[in-house]
């Protein structure tokens, strides 16, 4: 069919990252979020569908509000891209919203902000009920120095100290707008809002903050670590289990819905 007849759709989805080998589909056929989603979309579209995501997630990393766009010549009502697609998705993935968007909309390049939450359990014994849902440390954490340390993340900075060796980003300079830490019932929540994030950046930040909270790294040492701009001197990368992509920001004109973070999280 004529490509001029194609429609561009944006969908918001949630997924349990512990069930998949990351977002990106792989040649060896292991289960990934992208592969499962494109298979389900093709069932509704009656044609192959290729997706573009706001931000790829690694194995074990979850999303409550990931955004994807795709093009199709199939004329389907909005609910077909929600309920219809969900009927063909495996457990662990759900489409929350769908919206036809302007043909120039791009899920990745039009995003000007991203939100992440890291959920951390601090307890002598790891709860089996939180396995794959939260990170864990047996160490008792002092939240106040962790908050003071997190304040040093705010602003435009070179975050090379929290950048994975395999990161493909062109620049390590990113802007963090908000870095909040809260604690209740043995769970620590780190909320980060920034324009973009480096590979493993949130997990590396969490690893360093755990060092601060347990007394292995001072607040001043955390601040100095950022200025070092060297991953070699930083604490280890923290586990993926507790990391959630909780939102993506777009210009209002596109009408992309950003759901509230679920109360259970």
UniProtKB/Swiss-Prot annotation:
HAMAP family: TruA. Substrate binds at residue 116. Keywords: Isomerase, tRNA processing. This is tRNA pseudouridine synthase A. It comes from Neisseria meningitidis serogroup A / serotype 4A (strain DSM 15465 / Z2491). GO terms for molecular function: RNA binding; tRNA pseudouridine(38-40) synthase activity. Belongs to the tRNA pseudouridine synthase TruA family. It comes from the Bacteria. GO terms for biological process: tRNA pseudouridine synthesis. Formation of pseudouridine at positions 38, 39 and 40 in the anticodon stem and loop of transfer RNAs. The keyword Isomerase applies. The keyword Plastid does not apply. Its EC number is 5.4.99.12. InterPro entries: PsdUridine_synth_cat_dom_sf, PsdUridine_synth_TruA, PsdUridine_synth_TruA_a/b_dom, PsdUridine_synth_TruA_C, TruA/RsuA/RluB/E/F_N. The active site is at residue 58.
């Amino acid at each position: 069919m004529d490509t001029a007849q194609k429609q561009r759709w944006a969908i918001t989805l949630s997924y349990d990252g512990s069930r998949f080998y990351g977002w990106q589909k792989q040649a060896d056929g292991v289960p990934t979020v992208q592969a499962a989603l494109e298979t389900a979309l093709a069932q509704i579209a009656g044609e192959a569908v290729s997706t573009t995501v706001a931000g790829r997630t690694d194995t074990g990393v979850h999303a409550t509000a990931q955004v994807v766009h795709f093009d199709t010549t199939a004329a389907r009502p909005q609910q077909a891209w929600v309920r219809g697609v969900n009927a063909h998705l495996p457990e662990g993935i759900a489409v929350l919203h769908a919206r036809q968007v302007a043909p120039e909309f791009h899920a990745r390049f039009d995003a000007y902000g991203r939100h992440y939450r890291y959920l951390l359990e601090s307890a002598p014994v790891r709860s089996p009920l939180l396995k794959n849902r939260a990170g864990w440390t047996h160490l008792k954490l002092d939240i106040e120095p962790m908050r003071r340390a997190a304040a040093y993340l705010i602003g435009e900075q070179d975050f090379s100290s929290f950048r994975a060796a395999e990161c493909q980003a062109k620049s390590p300079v990113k802007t963090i707008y908000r870095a909040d830490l809260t604690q209740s019932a043995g769970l620590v929540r780190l909320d980060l809002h920034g324009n973009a994030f480096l590979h493993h950046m949130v997990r590396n930040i969490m690893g360093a903050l755990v060092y601060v909270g347990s007394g292995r790294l001072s607040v001043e040492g955390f601040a100095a670590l950022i200025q070092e701009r060297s991953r070699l001197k930083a604490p280890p990368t923290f586990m993926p289990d507790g990391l959630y992509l909780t939102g993506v920001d777009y210009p209002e004109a596109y009408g992309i819905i950003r759901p509230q973070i679920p109360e259970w999280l």
